Curated annotation (Swiss-Prot):
Protein name listed in UniProt: Cytochrome c oxidase assembly factor 3, mitochondrial
Organism ancestry: Eukaryota, Fungi, Dikarya, Ascomycota, Saccharomycotina
Homology family: Belongs to the COA3 family.
One GO location term (cellular component): mitochondrial inner membrane
Keyword terms, alphabetized: Membrane, Mitochondrion, Mitochondrion inner membrane, Transmembrane, Transmembrane helix
Annotated localization: Mitochondrion inner membrane
InterPro entries reported in the protein's UniProt record: Coa3 (IPR041752), Coa3_cc (IPR018628)
Organism encoding this protein: Scheffersomyces stipitis (strain ATCC 58785 / CBS 6054 / NBRC 10063 / NRRL Y-11545)
Record membrane topology: Single-pass membrane protein
Principal location class: mitochondrion
């Protein structure tokens, strides 16, 4: 089977001993640095903008117009007992 790529032990973009980037790899990546940085800024700004818009719209929302259904006193005491029992178990 044929081996694809550089010969074993030979990598022109990484130092074989330290595995650090060589100057050749820095030169190859240099033209793409600013384009990638701009792309990262755009890809970060879109979800951040959606999040900030959603947070802004939710902070203005009033929940006072939503009616709360009435609860009877017996049902309230039953729920309190269930809550206390679950709190004591933890």
């Amino acid at each position: 089977m044929a081996v694809i790529g550089a010969p074993k032990g030979h990598d022109r973009y990484r130092d074989p001993k330290t595995h650090q980037m060589t100057p050749a790899l820095y030169r190859v990546r240099a033209p793409f640095f600013w384009k990638n940085t701009i792309g990262l800024a755009i890809c970060t700004a879109i979800p951040l903008g959606v999040y900030m818009y959603t947070l802004h719209m939710l902070s203005k929302d009033e929940f006072g117009d939503i009616p709360i259904p009435p609860i009877s006193d017996t049902e309230l005491t039953k729920l309190k007992k269930e809550y206390e029992a679950s709190k004591n178990q933890n």
